[in-house]
């Protein structure tokens, strides 16, 4: 019934198995990949014919985590998986980025890659396995895929690279880097680092590339056993048409790509395109060509002209040389009621970034396969259509926005203060108000400034820069601070963020083979120069975190109570803590280890809440004097509330110095009195005294008398 083929290798000290022919046999390609006890199923289906009216590769990638993989049932009312989580979206993009450039030019058939996590062993993150399985399924599917690719995660622990560190090892690593590529070339890098230098980062990339070679060979071995015949894609030679169109509009197109202002440049390019379309599609005549074909050739010519100009003259679209960063204006405190804000403008790219400080109530609970955890740092990136002068639908967060937000998050996360030192929940929102390339890196710069404006003590200011590369044979040009057009028309774009000490985040996307380690080294060195320049420009606005929090930011005080007192502070059904919050106006969070966080924008509110909590969680001190309130009058004495929720008895004999006939002669309910804690009786009841305390001054009369007697005896 089954025609099963499999390959198994030892990879990083754990078995990696790739199997096909047993599950999902109606898909064009299906591979079950197992690493340790983590198992994923990757499937590929490609439509039989090209999609009409598209001039791009219609590829979709969906990575799906099933909770049964970790032996759990989903939360929520419906008890089933819902919309994609942030991690599912990020891993889907992680798979898409290295495989997309490897499809043969001209492939227009809808292609869908679905990766499902079937089992998670809590040691091996499924994302690397998902990349490997996707590559294998594509290689088997018959789709025109110029793979296979391999992938690996690289850690850096105790000054050594670690291949595919386990989830436990990731706690101690200074680096979390994912690298993917073919046997000959690196295609994609995604990373977060703790201020590591360029040599360590590049070394990690090459380490990962070397160590996923066995995976590439294993996929080739599996393909030799089970791959379908590759589908043919008709390759059309457009050289004659290119030459013809170039002769028609070359001067106009070259002139257009010398206009520095984006909107003016687009208008000039649009006129050149109209001229081409009018030439090939005259009114009233039968067209000789398909419109998409002519538009595609025109697009190719745009790329070639920009590339020729840069390589031949050293000048870019806006007149800069390859190393110059656009003009930068950085401002802080631009919004009066925000806790922290910054407006970062670099050329025609602008980000309005706002920081909000919250409390433990604002932490985000994240439900993942490896368990539920709380996230105290959130960074959200929004890219409205007006930022590029267009109209568009406003709706849910798009994949690109999630990806760019996470890239900026990775850049800032390593420089945040430890949560126990700065116990706030931080939310940073980057609103892209203008965009012409590098908006994610503008978000990094703006986030750093907005956090410091809010008084968050970052280790060091952080900046980001987007770089590009153009390669033609032996000639290449590395471009600093790329424009949007340079991003689309280049062979490599990579984004580097970090401090003056080192890199905190690196993302690379390489579209062609032939980019060597030496070229990458040059590019990273140039990126460092650009980053240091940007940090200098940012320092004109703010060099360090403000000494005080913003006027409207909450203040948080942290202290500890004994864990066996937590129940008393919370009370039955939360009654006590609710009363504290309602009457003081402060927010209170208590962790399982007894850490108490009290937050409010009003200092007196915090003091009142802390005093209340400590009165419950602490024990009263023997012989100490307390302010109290009479809560009940009895024949034998009065009960006084004197220490938080604690009551004690003032016996009738302890009410006043003389003989007291009736308790009500001295006190009544609601009276404010001063009492001294005498001790506890045999049943543990609290004994108090009023007569040994001066009810006006609160002075201890008993101690005063003893002191006087001692002085007399000394005489």
Curated annotation (Swiss-Prot):
SUPFAM superfamilies: Eukaryotic type KH-domain (KH-domain type I), Nucleic acid-binding proteins, Ribonuclease PH domain 2-like, Ribosomal protein S5 domain 2-like
Subcellular location(s) of the protein: Cytoplasm
One GO molecular-function entry: 3'-5'-RNA exonuclease activity
Keywords: Cytoplasm, Magnesium, Metal-binding, Nucleotidyltransferase, RNA-binding, Transferase
InterPro entries found in the cross-reference section: ExoRNase_PH_dom1, ExoRNase_PH_dom2, ExoRNase_PH_dom2_sf, KH_dom, KH_dom_type_1, KH_dom_type_1_sf, NA-bd_OB-fold, PNPase
Catalysed conversion reaction: RNA(n+1) + phosphate = RNA(n) + a ribonucleoside 5'-diphosphate
Classification via PROSITE patterns: KH_TYPE_1, S1
The organism's place on the tree of life at top rank: Bacteria
Record-level GO BP terms: mRNA catabolic process; RNA processing
E.C. number(s) listed in UniProt: 2.7.7.8
Pfam family, one: RNase_PH
Record domain KH: where: 554-613
PANTHER family: POLYRIBONUCLEOTIDE NUCLEOTIDYLTRANSFERASE (PTHR11252), POLYRIBONUCLEOTIDE NUCLEOTIDYLTRANSFERASE 1, MITOCHONDRIAL (PTHR11252:SF0)
Purpose: Involved in mRNA degradation. Catalyzes the phosphorolysis of single-stranded polyribonucleotides processively in the 3'- to 5'-direction.
Family designation: Belongs to the polyribonucleotide nucleotidyltransferase family.
Alphabetical list of HAMAP family matching this protein: PNPase
Name of the protein described by the UniProt record: Polyribonucleotide nucleotidyltransferase
Native species: Rhodopseudomonas palustris (strain BisB18)
């Amino acid at each position: 019934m089954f025609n099963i083929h499999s390959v198994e290798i030892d990879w990083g000290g754990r078995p990696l198995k790739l199997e096909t022919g047993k599950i999902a046999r109606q898909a064009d390609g299906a591979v079950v990949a197992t690493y340790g006890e983590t198992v994923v199923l990757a499937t590929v289906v490609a439509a039989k014919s090209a999609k009409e009216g598209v001039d791009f590769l219609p590829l979709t990638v969906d990575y799906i985590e099933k909770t049964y993989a970790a032996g759990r049932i989903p939360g929520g009312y419906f008890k089933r998986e819902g919309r994609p989580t942030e991690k599912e979206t990020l891993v889907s993009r992680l798979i898409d980025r290295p495989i997309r450039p490897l499809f043969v030019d001209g492939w227009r058939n809808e292609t869908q890659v679905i990766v499902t996590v079937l089992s998670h062993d809590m040691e091996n993150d499924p994302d690397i396995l998902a990349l490997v399985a996707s590559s294998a399924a594509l290689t088997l599917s018959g789709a025109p895929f110029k793979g296979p690719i391999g992938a690996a995660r690289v850690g850096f622990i105790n000054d050594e690279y670690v291949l595919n560190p386990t989830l436990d090892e990731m706690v101690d690593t200074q680096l979390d880097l994912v690298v993917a590529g073919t046997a000959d070339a690196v295609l994609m890098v995604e990373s977060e680092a703790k201020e590591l230098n360029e040599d360590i980062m590049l070394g990690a990339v090459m380490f990962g590339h070397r160590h996923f070679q066995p995976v590439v060979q294993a996929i080739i071995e599996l393909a030799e056993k089970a791959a379908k015949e590759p589908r043919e894609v008709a390759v059309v030679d457009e050289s004659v048409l290119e030459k013809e169109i170039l002769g028609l509009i070359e001067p106009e197109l070259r002139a257009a790509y010398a206009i520095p202002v984006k909107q003016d440049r687009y208008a000039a390019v649009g006129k050149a395109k109209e001229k081409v379309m009018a030439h090939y599609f005259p009114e009233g005549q039968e067209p000789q060509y398909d419109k998409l074909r002519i538009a595609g050739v025109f697009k190719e010519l745009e790329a070639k002209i920009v590339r020729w100009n840069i390589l031949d003259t050293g000048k870019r679209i806006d007149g800069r040389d390859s190393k110059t960063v656009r003009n930068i204006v950085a401002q802080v405190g631009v919004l009066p009621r925000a806790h922290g804000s910054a407006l970062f403008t670099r050329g025609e790219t602008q980000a309005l970034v706002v920081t909000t400080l919250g409390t433990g109530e604002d932490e985000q609970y994240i439900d993942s396969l490896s368990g539920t955890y709380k996230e105290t740092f959130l960074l959200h990136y929004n890219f409205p259509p007006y930022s590029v002068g267009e109209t568009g639908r406003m709706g849910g967060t798009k994949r690109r926005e999630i990806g760019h937000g996470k890239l900026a998050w990775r850049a800032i996360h390593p420089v945040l203060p430890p949560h126990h030192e700065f116990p706030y929940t931080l939310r940073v929102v980057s609103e892209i108000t203008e965009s012409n390339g590098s908006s994610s890196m503008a978000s990094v710069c703006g986030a750093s400034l907005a956090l410091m404006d809010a008084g968050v003590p970052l280790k060091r200011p952080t900046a980001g820069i987007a770089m590009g590369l153009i390669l033609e044979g032996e000639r290449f040009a590395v471009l600093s601070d790329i424009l949007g057009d340079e991003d689309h028309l280049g062979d490599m774009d990579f984004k580097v963020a970090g401090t003056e000490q080192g890199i905190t985040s690196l993302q690379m996307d390489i579209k062609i083979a032939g980019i060597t380690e030496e070229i990458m080294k040059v590019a990273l060195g140039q990126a460092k120069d650009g980053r240091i320049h940007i940090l200098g420009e940012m320092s004109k606005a703010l060099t360090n975190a403000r000494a005080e929090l913003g006027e409207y930011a909450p203040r948080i005080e942290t202290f500890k109570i004994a864990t066996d007192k937590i129940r008393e502070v919370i009370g039955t059904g939360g009654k006590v803590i609710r009363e504290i919050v309602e009457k003081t106006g402060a927010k209170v969070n208590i962790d399982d280890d007894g850490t108490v966080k009290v937050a409010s924008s009003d200092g007196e509110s915090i003091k009142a809440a802390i005093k209340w909590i400590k009165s419950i969680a602490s024990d009263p001190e023997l012989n100490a004097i307390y302010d109290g309130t009479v809560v009940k009058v009895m024949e034998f004495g009065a009960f006084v509330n004197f220490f938080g929720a604690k009551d004690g008895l003032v016996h009738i004999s302890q009410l006043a110095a003389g003989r007291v006939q009736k308790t009500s002669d001295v006190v009544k309910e609601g009276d404010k009195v001063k009492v001294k804690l005498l001790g506890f009786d045999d049943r543990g009841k609290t004994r108090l005294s009023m007569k040994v305390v001066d009810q006006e001054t609160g002075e201890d009369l008993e101690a005063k008398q003893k002191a006087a007697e001692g002085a007399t005896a000394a005489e």
